[in-house]
Amino acid sequence: MYVAHLSLHDFRSYATAEVELSPGVTAFIGRNGQGKTNLVEAIDYLSRLSSHRVASDAPLVRAGADQAVVRAAVVRDGRTAVLEVELNPGRSNRARVNRSPLPRARDLVGLVRTVVFSPEDLTLVKGDPADRRRFLDDLLVLRVPRLAGVRADYDRVLRQRNTLLKTARKGGFARKGGFARKGGFAPLGPPEGRPEGPPEGRTGGSATSGPPSRSVALDTLAVWDAHLARTGAELLAERLALVEALRPYVGKAYETVARGATRDDAEIDYKPSFDLEGRTGRDDLVEALLAEVERRRGDELDRGVSLVGPHRDELLLTLGHGSPDSRLPVKGYASHGESWSFALALRLAAYDLLRADGDDPILILDDVFAELDTERRAQLADLVAGAEQVLVTAAVAADVPAGLAGARFAVGNGEVLREQ
């Protein structure tokens, strides 16, 4: 798989850009702020419909423009398809394949696959659990594109349920009074000093007219519990399976990247927000999630937030030998070099797993060599040199290892010029 042509309109710093590409290694060389990363970011966006640099689409649209367009001719198994996404901040994005509109923009996900190495990768090791969950989910969606819908459904359910919990909390639900019951909750009596029913001057139960009655709120919460368990169980089951598939690749990649620098083994383990007691099947996980939600009901009502589900899980990264209890967490214990080696191992493992699935994803090395010492630069270059397409960005040509010789573009002053 490789990108043969990239076309940008009002994307980041580019009013327009047209770049012809080829298989093998291509390096974009330019000073910081000249737009070299914007080029590879656009290709990665087509892969995941999200940026590895920012959380929202708004910064991706050039200042003063209403929308941005990214279009690429992608060659896969000898066939060329033109993929296009139209970014509309505040509105729905639109996607096309060979100029034919897709029902939903997310249907574009997975048609081109990328693996990005960037300076931000250190957050996979040193950042919050959310960074590691995103790493897993992005890889899940690349392998099984329909899971983009599952993840979107879970996020929607979580937002709705949190809103309802906050409403219930403001409405005066309390721990005492025996609120829990199987399949839902018994409504409590009014808080001390407050009459039963909606606040004075308000009627009904919409979000705009005031909080719903307690029985309505609790019955509605039971419905969202079921949605949370259903979508959460599917996402959780897929993550568990992914970690099992990824684990041997991480260990092998770390051993290669940190060659001679350590005798420790790199391990990854999935840590759910509660004890699964060995359950991994979807139906069993649905029951487990529902039971845990019921057990934590009081805490959730007290805090007004969902405390159970995949959004609270963690991907544990450890170094050492033996059982998980005998290994040390990378975050907080590993040196800077070990942390970088682990971050690179995660990306390399993702690349190797996608290749094992039968696809050779596009590798993007975004300013990553400037962060590595000479030995790690050479090791990484050796590992990725055989990929069908490798896109590299660097501030100076000297940052690109000799093992990654190939086409080069000079990027500056809004232009992308191929060097002869």
UniProtKB/Swiss-Prot annotation:
Pfam families the UniProt entry points to: SMC_N
A GO biological process held by the record: SOS response
Disordered: annotated span: 175-214
A GO molecular-function descriptor: single-stranded DNA binding
Compartment(s) of residence: Cytoplasm
Highest taxon listed in the record's lineage: Bacteria
Family: Belongs to the RecF family.
Protein name: DNA replication and repair protein RecF
Gene: recF
